[in-house]
Amino acid sequence: MVSSSPVSPSKETDRKSGEKWTAEDPSRPAKWWYSTFHTVTAMIGAGVLSLPYAMAYLGWGPGTFVLAMTWGLTLNTMWQMVQLHECVPGTRFDRYIDLGRYAFGPKLGPWIVLPQQLIVQVGCNIVYMVTGGKCLKQFVEITCSTCTPVRQSYWILGFGGVHFILSQLPNFNSVAGVSLAAAVMSLCYSTIAWGGSIAHGRVPDVSYDYKATNPGDFTFRVFNALGQISFAFAGHAVALEIQATMPSTPERPSKVPMWQGVIGAYVVNAVCYFPVALICYWAFGQDVDDNVLMNLQRPAWLIAAANLMVVVHVIGSYQVFAMPVFDLLERMMVNKFGFKHGVVLRFFTRTIYVAFTLFIGVSFPFFGDLLGFFGGFGFAPTSFFLPSIMWLIIKKPRRFSVTWFVNWISIIVGVFIMLASTIGGLRNIIADSSTYSFYA
């Protein structure tokens, strides 16, 4: 919802029907470090553990270049999102869809922005269901080797059960503690991943050649690797919603604390991503797993702790990505269908949504391939070219200026990643589905 000051009577009515974290609430108590750990929680997740696997298909030079280029381009587009939040004096675009309406028009904007944002948010929630269950299973198997093995689908169900409870937290600010814990865990398990790889050392006869597959399969796997890298930069889809929790005054607009938080988040991002991608690939080469923790076996207690940290982190990540979806669903039920806003509506809409993502996650546990598919189809638009397109429309930089060129580079790279990794991810899901048992 677009917020402005003063608030009109119609907007005041809408505000009273909304959650406390939504745009119209005058209380915006978040500090700059809130945006740091919210952004870290949204951005650093399951994707960091698949970066060495992407390196195995891209190689040292191209892989490092793609990772560095992606980091730089998405930092620039994140800066654009922060600046565009209050690009109209007296108005705050508190949601991605609000900015889309302003840039593309009230009719076209939602059709361009909302599907992409929902793909990111719902896609992340599905992937995090799979990741949480998979790592929870790994944790128990390491700590209790004599326990009776339990099917992975049951662990995913157990992980999903946590979200039936946490999803009832009313607003973004109420999940701040969960998000902070998740951000700390991401830094910890990333350190364990690259630190454990150093302690493990290089495997005998390590090879840095491209993974041995037929030419057609290799091409699709490279496409999927691009999607896995783009998945690692998914925070843009909730950037405006995070900034909406920041106070703003003429002397200190919200873009100041938000940008401070983003810089902090990207520093943490670099500290996590580059060591994991490069060191873990150095240790295992083309034999690295799509979840690098699977390659580490010793010390057992440390690997078990890392898996548990991943579980805690994706619990927080799920909530960060789900909260805007909850807001959208509840507003739709109130405004379009006349439901009364309250605890009952919150319980049913959020429970149904969690059950939906849980069902899809249990049915399609293709962790690595899901990363590539959703990474290209959803994250490339929201993180690469949609911010750049909106910047060109709203700010209208001089043609052939540095800003103009940087935006067009982001657009071209983003479109290529979207097409390539979506094709590669879908093809790999189809190919690998024969090796999995549904509800395994």
From Swiss-Prot:
A Gene Ontology biological process term: amino acid transport
Source organism, top-level taxon: Eukaryota
GO cellular component term, pick one: plasma membrane
Family: Belongs to the amino acid/polyamine transporter 2 family. Amino acid/auxin permease (AAAP) (TC 2.A.18.2) subfamily.
Compositionally skewed regions (Polar residues) per UniProt: 1-10
PANTHER family with a match to the protein in the record: OS05G0424000 PROTEIN-RELATED (PTHR48017)
Listed name of the protein: Lysine histidine transporter-like 6
